[in-house]
Amino acid sequence: MQHSAWHALIKEQLPEGYFAKINHFLDEVYASGTIYPPREKVFNAIQTTDLADVKVVILGQDPYHGPRQAQGLSFSVPDDIPAPPSLQNILKELADDIGVKESHDLTSWAQQGVLLLNAGLTVPAGQANAHAGLIWESFTDAIIKVVNEKSDPVVFILWGSYARKKKALISNPQHLIIESAHPSPLSAYRGFFGSKPFSRTNDFLVAKGLEPINWLA
């Protein structure tokens, strides 16, 4: 990340020495037990999607906390791992909205400019949200602020109350915010199903003269 466009702009948004603080945190937690995702994938979202290419942001809360699930991309798991319930519902809504995506690895979305960003970037095995409030929120809020400053239109997809709070960071009138209930089985029937975020995103991108996302790739 040090040599990417992300690095300098994120650094501007953070207190002096924050990157060193993150590295110290990573050294400590990865030495202390099993942490997901693998350390080399912690920054996968901004390593896979260049700032210049970002057209869509899908914000998650924290990584999956089961073995081999987390890839450093929000909601995504490798194809040899069963899709967790929220991802199953995302793919169900996609099927109803546009068509069937056979893979539940979302890397192809990230490669097309969909920033799959979790608010927290690490989690201990079996302990959802255990790293919440420790270090990541300032860093990932900085990423959202950097994307907000893009002159090109971006779609921010905010699912659930946690993600929707991030609207406060999105002030650029060029951008579109699509929000609904979370795809979790606990809330998907309260407005996530039927919200058509994928076709709405593409309609907006096309209207702005941008390439739509191939959500089925």
UniProtKB/Swiss-Prot annotation:
Name under which the protein is recorded: Uracil-DNA glycosylase
Catalysed reaction equations from the record: Hydrolyzes single-stranded DNA or mismatched double-stranded DNA and polynucleotides, releasing free uracil
CC terms in the record's Gene Ontology section: cytoplasm
Annotated function: Excises uracil residues from the DNA which can arise as a result of misincorporation of dUMP residues by DNA polymerase or due to deamination of cytosine.
E.C. number(s) listed in UniProt: 3.2.2.27
GO BP of this protein: base-excision repair, AP site formation via deaminated base removal
UniProt keywords, alphabetically: Cytoplasm, DNA damage, DNA repair, Hydrolase
Family under the similarity heading: Belongs to the uracil-DNA glycosylase (UDG) superfamily. UNG family.
CDD domains: UDG-F1-like
GO molecular-function terms, A-Z: uracil DNA N-glycosylase activity
SUPFAM superfamilies noted in UniProt: Uracil-DNA glycosylase-like
SMART domains: UDG (SM00986), UreE_C (SM00987)
Subcellular localization: Cytoplasm
